[in-house]
């Protein structure tokens, strides 16, 4: 069983979008996938409910409930945890202890980047992170590669002690897919294949570290 925690202290960074598409990827691969929704908005749960009829359904579990771990089926192969919005390192201890890797989405603006620093500093106090026994990867999200702002943001992220493991472009495709309970991995159109390619570095990193 592999567990991936998706966390960010900054609201609107794309945490749930990253979580749902990641869960869909593993489900499309044929793996028994659970999405632990620890965000009080429960947008990830609603996404799971919309695809419950599919062969690639993802089982939602309420991560805000007491003893939520007991609801994880024994045949689960992959767990994706959508962390609570605005949570700092100390608030994530229960999820961090389960995680095999952590993904942190960051938007391409100095305000968002600066807001992420205290979060990463708080996570660094965790014993597993401090001892480098828990891999942490940054994901540049909603990037517009043709703009100076996005290019500068990526360069700034690369100067941090954590690896930039992926760069996801700004596109309405994610908004449309989430509304349908789908992901960019559920279709084989040429347009969506280009978005799938954006995920290759993230998936390669996860395969390497867990």
What do these predicted regions represent?
Residues 3-9, 13, 20-97, 178-185:
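P-loop/Walker-type NTP enzyme "switch/lid" segment
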Residues 84-166, 170:
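Conserved catalytic-core segment of NTP-binding enzymes
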Residues 11-12, 41, 110, 144, ...:
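Surface-exposed, flexible loop/turn segments at secondary-structure boundaries
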Residues 18, 118, 173:
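Residue-level recognition of oxygen-bearing side chains
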Residues 144-210:
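Conserved GTP-binding G-domain of TRAFAC-class P-loop NTPases and closely related GTPase folds
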């Amino acid at each position: 069983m592999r567990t991936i925690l998706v966390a960010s202290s900054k609201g609107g960074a794309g945490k749930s979008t990253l979580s749902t598409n990641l869960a869909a990827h593993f489900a499309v691969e044929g793996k028994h996938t659970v999405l632990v929704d620890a965000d009080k908005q429960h947008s990830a749960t609603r996404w799971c409910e919309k695809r419950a009829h599919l062969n690639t359904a993802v089982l939602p579990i309420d991560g805000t409930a007491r003893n939520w771990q007991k609801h994880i089926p024994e045949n689960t192969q992959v767990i994706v945890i959508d962390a609570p919005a605005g949570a700092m390192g100390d608030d994530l201890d229960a999820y961090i202890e389960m995680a095999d890797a952590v993904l942190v989405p960051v938007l391409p603006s100095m305000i968002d980047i600066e807001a992420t620093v205290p979060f990463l500093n708080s996570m660094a106090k965790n014993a597993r992170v401090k001892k480098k026994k828990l891999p942490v990867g940054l994901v540049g999200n909603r990037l517009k590669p043709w703009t100076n702002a996005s290019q500068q943001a990526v360069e700034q992220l690369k100067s941090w002690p954590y690896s930039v493991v992926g760069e996801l472009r700004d596109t309405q495709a994610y908004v449309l897919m989430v509304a349908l309970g789908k992901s960019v991995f559920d279709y084989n159109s040429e347009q969506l294949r280009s978005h799938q390619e954006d995920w290759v570095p993230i998936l390669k990193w996860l395969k390497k570290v867990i």
